[in-house]
């Protein structure tokens, strides 16, 4: 496997800005669509048969948007998905994503399921609360969701880009939950080096010239795959 560069928080922010600048001309919605599709593809690969429902917990930013897109694609793949999206934004992009999900028949929950419900009624919980831009304290209602629910349930958890609440560069310094599956997007973040579960890289959208300009090294994607397994990668 080719070498992999783990990004600092600032590197991830700068690269995202470059990707969406005039030179490379990507838009937020196009990147979100590709990221969400890759997340759904990883989940279908790792959990091909889930007899129970899937719950996606969405945060207010782009990571939550990735979760909305992934949920829509999972329904297309045959999964039964619920979404809990407690803190929404007024931006049109997110309104559109919610509308698209509703037209797929996805139910948006009014309240967070209890831990018993999560353990008994759901076969997978998707954590799309916070991504690479997270820093500082975990605020309501996500502090309760993470500390009271995700920290204590037995249902498998799949985190998008970073496990929510982890320090992007230093990892799980707050002793929070560890997901069963982590789907890093574009390139893994420095804080995920300590992650010991199933680890996949998604977000297959970086142009060759972009990789050269940024000296970013990522593994090769095979064929038309939207992801690559980096679980056994050793630095």
Swiss-Prot record:
Annotated EC: 5.1.99.6
Binding annotation for (6S)-NADPHX: 62-66, 131-137, 161
Residues that hold K(+) according to the record: 63, 127, 164
SUPFAM superfamilies in alphabetical order: YjeF N-terminal domain-like
CC cofactor: K(+)
Molecular functions (GO terms): metal ion binding; NAD(P)HX epimerase activity; nucleotide binding
Catalytic reaction equation(s): (6R)-NADHX = (6S)-NADHX; (6R)-NADPHX = (6S)-NADPHX
Entry note: cofactor: Binds 1 potassium ion per subunit.
GO cellular component: mitochondrion
Keywords: Isomerase, Metal-binding, NAD, NADP, Nucleotide-binding, Potassium
Pfam families: YjeF_N
Enzyme class: isomerase
Matches recorded under Gene3D superfamilies: YjeF N-terminal domain
InterPro entries linked: YjeF_N_dom, YjeF_N_dom_sf, YJEFN_prot_NAXE-like
Primary role: Catalyzes the epimerization of the S- and R-forms of NAD(P)HX, a damaged form of NAD(P)H that is a result of enzymatic or heat-dependent hydration. This is a prerequisite for the S-specific NAD(P)H-hydrate dehydratase to allow the repair of both epimers of NAD(P)HX.
HAMAP family: NADHX_epimerase
Classification via NCBIfam families: yjeF_nterm (TIGR00197)
Family (UniProt): Belongs to the NnrE/AIBP family.
Protein name: NAD(P)H-hydrate epimerase
Natural source organism: Dictyostelium discoideum (Social amoeba)
């Amino acid at each position: 496997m080719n070498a992999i560069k783990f990004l600092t928080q600032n590197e991830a922010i700068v690269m995202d800005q470059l990707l969406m600048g005039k030179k490379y001309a990507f838009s937020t919605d196009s990147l979100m669509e590709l990221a969400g599709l890759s997340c759904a593809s990883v989940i279908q690969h790792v959990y091909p048969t889930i007899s129970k429902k899937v719950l996606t917990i969405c945060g207010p930013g782009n990571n939550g948007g990735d979760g909305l897109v992934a949920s829509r694609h999972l329904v297309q793949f045959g999964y039964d998905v619920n979404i809990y999206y407690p803190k929404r934004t007024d931006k049109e992009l997110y309104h559109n994503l919610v509308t698209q999900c509703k037209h797929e028949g996805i139910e948006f929950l009014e309240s967070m399921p209890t831990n018993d419900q999560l353990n008994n009624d759901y076969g997978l919980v998707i954590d799309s609360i916070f991504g690479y831009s997270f820093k500082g304290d975990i605020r309501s209602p996500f502090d309760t969701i993470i500390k009271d629910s995700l920290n204590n349930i037995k249902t498998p958890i799949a985190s998008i880009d970073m496990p929510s609440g982890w320090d992007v560069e230093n990892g799980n310094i707050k002793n929070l939950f560890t997901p069963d599956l982590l789907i890093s997007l574009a390139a893994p973040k420095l804080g995920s080096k300590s992650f010991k579960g199933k680890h996949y890289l998604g977000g297959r959208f970086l142009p060759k010239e972009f990789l050269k300009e940024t000296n970013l090294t990522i593994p090769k994607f095979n064929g038309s795959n939207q992801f690559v397994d980096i679980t056994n990668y050793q630095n």
